[in-house]
C-alpha cells in the first residue's frame, strides 16, 4: 500500500507542480515562524542551502505530527548574492531595492526538499540554480513592478520566472524546477524508490 503523500506548503506553485505531475496528495501549510528559525541559523554562519534544508525539515516535521505514517514533503527556497541572504520583499519599495541590487549580477537560488515520516527524516536534498540578471535601468524596474504589482511580494527575488520575470535575465544555470522552488526530478525519483508513486 502506497503511503499518503502530504505537501507541507501553502504555495500554489508547489501544489500545481505536484498536481501537474499527476501525484495524489494532500496539502497542509506548516505553522512555523520561518524568520525566527532563520535568524539564529544565519547568525551562526549557516550557508543559504543549509538554511533552506533546516526550514524544509521544520515544515515537514510540523505537518507530520498530524498524519501518522504519511510521507510529508517539506520544501523551502533561499536566495543569496555573495554574503547577502534575501527574503520576500515587505513592500514595493523593498522589491525595487532587491531588483536594483540584483541588476547585472549573478545570484543563487537554493531549493531544498526534506521527506519526513513519523517525525523521522527519510531524505534530504538541495539543488542550486545560478541566475544572472541583465543590467536593469531604474525606469525599467519601476515599469516592471508597476506591471506585475503585488505578485513581486510573493517570491524571494521579487520576480516570477514563469511570468514576466523572465525578462529580467540574461543567463540561467540550473534546473527549472529548482528555480520554481521544488526540484521535481530528484523528488519523483526518491518517491519511486520509496514505493510512494508508481515506478
Curated annotation (Swiss-Prot):
Reaction(s) this enzyme catalyzes, per UniProt: N(7)-methyl-GTP + H2O = N(7)-methyl-GMP + diphosphate + H(+)
Stated name of the protein: 7-methyl-GTP pyrophosphatase
Record localization: Cytoplasm
Enzyme superclass (EC): hydrolase
Assigned GO CC terms: cytoplasm
E.C. designation(s): 3.6.1.-
SUPFAM superfamilies named among the record's database cross-references: ITPase-like (SSF52972)
Catalytic residues (positions): 76
PANTHER family on file: BIFUNCTIONAL DTTP/UTP PYROPHOSPHATASE/METHYLTRANSFERASE PROTEIN-RELATED, BIFUNCTIONAL DTTP_UTP PYROPHOSPHATASE_METHYLTRANSFERASE PROTEIN-RELATED
Pfam families registered for this protein in UniProt: Maf
GO biological process, one term: nucleotide metabolic process
Role of this protein: Nucleoside triphosphate pyrophosphatase that hydrolyzes 7-methyl-GTP (m(7)GTP). May have a dual role in cell division arrest and in preventing the incorporation of modified nucleotides into cellular nucleic acids.
Cited InterPro entries: ITPase-like_fam, Maf-like
Native species: Rhizobium meliloti (strain 1021) (Ensifer meliloti)
Residues of the site described as Important for substrate specificity: 13, 77, 162
Keywords from the UniProt entry: Cytoplasm, Hydrolase, Nucleotide metabolism
Cofactor field: a divalent metal cation
UniProt keyword Hydrolase, yes or no: yes
Broad class of where this protein is predominantly found: cytoplasm
Assigned protein family: Belongs to the Maf family. YceF subfamily.
GO molecular function, one term: nucleoside triphosphate diphosphatase activity
